Amino acid sequence: MAFLSSPSLRSSEEFLVLTSEFKDCYFKTGLSQGHRFYKLKIQNFIVPLMDIYQSGIRPILFSALKADPEWLHQQTLQLLGWLARTRERPPSSWVQSQLQKTYCLSDAAIEQTLWGLKFPNPLGLAAGFDKDGVAATIWGSLGFGFAELGTVTFQAQPGNPRPRLFRLAEDKAALNRMGFNNHGAEALVRRLDSLKVEKLQVEEGLNVESDAPYVATASSLGAATLPLSPDNLHPSPPAEPLNLSIPLGINLGKSKVTPLEDAAADYLGSFRLLKDWGDYFVVNVSSPNTPGLRSLQDSAQLGLILETLQQENQGLKPILVKIAPDLEWDAIADVVKLAQIHQLAGIVATNTTIRRDMLKTQRIEATGKSVNEEAGGISGAPLRQRSTEVIRFIHQQTQGLLPIIGVGGIFTAEDAWEKITAGASLIQVYTGWVYEGPWMVRRILEGLVQKLEERGLSSISEAVGLDSKQAGG
């Protein structure tokens, strides 16, 4: 069991992945030695393992080790990235099959087709976790119905100074001021292409020389530069698709070095590079961690960005906009109108909040400062109610005709059901997944199936906006 003590595997997600691997190794060994084991359903393990994680492992990771949350995050992606890159070869292929058995739930009741894309379930990974597509091909094996990469910017950028990610355990929340740290749009294209090449090499019996992660070079990061013009970028579409089991979204942000007046060109540059790689795209104008970005939610500025992207898009890919929870109702209504005018595919509601009045946490231990002194956005449980209110408002404003991806404070099946019945066709998690562990996805999906059965509904799409339908008689 040496792998359990590896110093490079310390995040909650990594530990739990290896715990699952250890469990299956144990049963396989026992069977090979002729011992008699009763076949146990995977569901029987989920509740006790959740209890072990929440009462034993999580307190150690969050408190006793006092490890930097960003460092733990990087360790998680390092492991998942290795699984993604080597997924067609043993032992990764075997590990991935065990992940699927443990974390995935297949049920026709929670499947739906939206924008011509088949979603095996409505629960996706929110943007921010896998900014550079390190583990793009693995998320379906962890039970997610879709995954959103990014936020990615046209120019590579380091983000804000560290520390920039803090856990607020008392609130089941996180405070982040990451600042769109990423390798840039071109590097994401190269990484996704490398994952595709890895698959083709294995299928064709070619030697794959290295398991080393893709690292963007200075030349690759600088190949696409501002100023942009319609003739600057002519990326070649992928010769072969990634053929993922789930839809892949890409979240686009503005480069920090780009003036606000050039924002439309900046978003366009990223979209041109990535449009053949994503199944849908999200325009992020709502992060509180890039100076002036939220001002792009203003009708004039946002209208120009959306018009520019849709002219390039020509209706080929679903484009959504992600909004802040801190907007007034009139401002949200304006965004909804713009979404309709520019024929957007939907709205993502919501991003993180800059409010602090709902927090129990008063001081950030890592910095010694008051939570009110620390810049950044709050995600997690404190955001649940407001994001649901925004979802309900948008659903009512559009009579349910504009699909919504609901995100903010989802930890349980009840939280997920609340957002779906408020009007969200799809939902996303990030902070909740970190707190609850990887079994959370399957637990939520099983809870949604149960709620559909209790209400006599045959499909998750029938539950979308159910609160509004019932209120209207």
Report the location of each language-model feature.
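C-terminal helical cap(s) of enzyme catalytic domains, especially alpha/beta-barrels
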Residues: G159-K172, M358-N372, V434-L457
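Alpha-helix-loop-beta-strand connector modules within alpha/beta enzyme cores
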Residues: A173, H183-E186, R191-K199, D298-I319, ...
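Short, basic, low-complexity termini and linkers enriched in Ser/Thr/Gly/Pro
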Residues: F3, P7, F15-F27, F37-I46, ...
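Catalytic cores of alpha/beta
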Residues: V134-W139, L327-A339, F411-I427
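Glycine-rich phosphate-binding active-site loops on the catalytic face of alpha/beta enzymes
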Residues: E148-F154, G346-T353, T421-R443
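Glycine/Thr-rich beta-alpha phosphate-binding loop at enzyme active sites
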Residues: S93-S106, V285-Q301, Q340-G400
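N-terminal capping/small domains of soluble enzymes
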Residues: P48-K196, L200, P213, L242-S245, ...
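Active-site glycine- and acidic-residue-rich loops that bind
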Residues: S255-Y267, S295, V321-Q340
